[in-house]
Amino acid sequence: MKALVFNPFSGAAGDMILGCTLDLGADRKTVKELIEASVNVSVDIREVVKKGIKALDVRINIPEKEQVRTYPELLDVVKAAKLPSSVEASALGIFSKLAEAEASVHGQPDLEKLHFHEVGQSDALADIIGSSAAIHSLNCDSVYCTPINVGSGTIECAHGVMPVPAPATLELLKKGKFYFRGGTEQKELLTPTGAAILAHFAGPLESFPQGRVISIGYGAGDSELSGPNVLQGTLCELDSCLIPDIIEVLETNADDVSGEVLGNLFEELLAMGARDVAILPATMKKGRPAHVIKVIAKPEDTAKLARKIIVETGSLGVRVIPTRHRLMAARRIESVNFEVEGQIYESAVKIARDSEGILLNMSAEFEDCKKIAKQSGIPVKEVMRKAEEAARKLFS
């Protein structure tokens, strides 16, 4: 599986994303012509060296004075450009995310009345259209982003002095569920435009996924920093058998909870969205019998599941083991009909495939097979075997 991984150790801006993707192999001539045909700008692309790292610097030359554009006006510019459908959809999606972020910050529910200042200029339009075209041209199966260095300090903008990250940028970080951190540089390293492009295309990662590097690209930023002001991107070939997924593991010890309470908690955690739950017997200090409760969850479900564990068990706290990058097979549920003792029954079967569609495993749904076993008098193990055989004939 081919993946694009952005590594924003010096932040990200629209022109840095554009430069990075062009350096990775997107067609420079095609993207440049597309930008200049869509927006009243000229584009210069050149190689520079930033603190010892060669990078691609993209300069968008715009008219000296431009009017502030509204959200509908920006959409009109994109639609009038006659872009390829995938590029147009991405550009509109990015501006939609920007609009929602600005609306949330300013308390303006009517997007039609939103005025864009910095992100409404032609250079931002060019960055968004160009980055969308370049990313699509790389033909990746997926796009990811490692933790983002947002910078620190304050910035001056149309609404006055704002903290870093700017409020709209922070909303976009929230929307994309990105990991981010401050830095020693007293500058804005992640711009709203950069954040919006990443939020549209990329999923969050805490660290690089397992895979092999195909190519590396660097997009140059404008400012001179203490380190290289570049956005690093890599095209990687991930393990074709598996698909990346982000999880967190919750864990706590419970030494004064009955089996009935633990059984109920087990069911409720699964109903609330836990990916898996394990309750293990343990011995604590002074020989007290206890249980270790472990829960696998998506990051967005961690807080509510942790609260549920505390409320139900009386535990004083829940450990959240640092987010892990796991690899899993793509799974789907199918129904199959099969014969048992002359009678036709139906059962769900879980089918696992890799990203290339190769069958990895089939597993009959236990609860369905248990009901069939009770009705037919056949051992549940035999019922499961028959269900899986029927599934193999249909889906192999």
Curated annotation (Swiss-Prot):
The UniProt entry, under InterPro entries, shows: Ni_insertion (IPR002822)
Q: What GO molecular-function term can you cite, just one?
A: nickel cation binding
Q: What is this protein called?
A: Putative nickel insertion protein
Please give the family membership noted in the entry.
Belongs to the LarC family.
What lineage, starting at the top, does this entry show?
Archaea, Methanobacteriati, Methanobacteriota, Stenosarchaea group, Methanomicrobia
Q: Which Pfam families match?
A: Ni_insertion (PF01969)
Keywords, A to Z, come to: Nickel
Q: Does the keyword Nuclease apply?
A: no
Looking up HAMAP family in the UniProt record yields: LarC
